[in-house]
Amino acid sequence: VGALTPLAVAGLAVDVATRRHPGWRALTTAVTTWAVVGAQSLSHEGRVMADVLASGDLDAARHRLPHLCGRDPEALDAPQIARGTVESMAENTSDAAVASILWCAVGGLPAMLVHRGSNTLDAMIGHHNDRYENFGKVAAKLDDALNWLPARLTGALAALCAPEVGGNRSHTWATVRAEHDHHPSPNGGWCEAAWAAALAVQLG
């Protein structure tokens, strides 16, 4: 938690400094949100990966996969890379986009920056690591807590948008409710189950 204090203080300082200047407040919030929310880069990586896979260039697809997730791509074939891409995009839609916007709406810049810092710490040391084991566990638990509501909101939004990709809203939501707890992550299942049902593919 102490590692996130500077982010909270910085966000609070900007918030206080711009409180009497609505124009500057709106500008700093917009710029920070644009920098924090990873939706544009996420969609770009997804489109690039789709084009690479469609071209049949497996080496290029393996080279691009680390841009989306931490899996070792060398032993993966094209269907496995495609599945890893969709799974990563599903979870990152929640972590990078929905959660950041939600926390900004709830607590302004301080809350959004703390969430982003927590998410970054989890990505860096949240997995088992002998050197940072205890710190990593705290980072992972905090990230799970901060993404609890955004993940469920992401699942609901994916169900709502399912017809845009040929899916069915009620079927997608029913699948989310039935399958989300089969995922090892307390949050990842909500996102992945929704995307799997909407796209009619198998994930996880």
Model-derived features with residue positions:
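Hydrophobic alpha-helical transmembrane segments
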Residues: 1-113, 118-121, 126-204
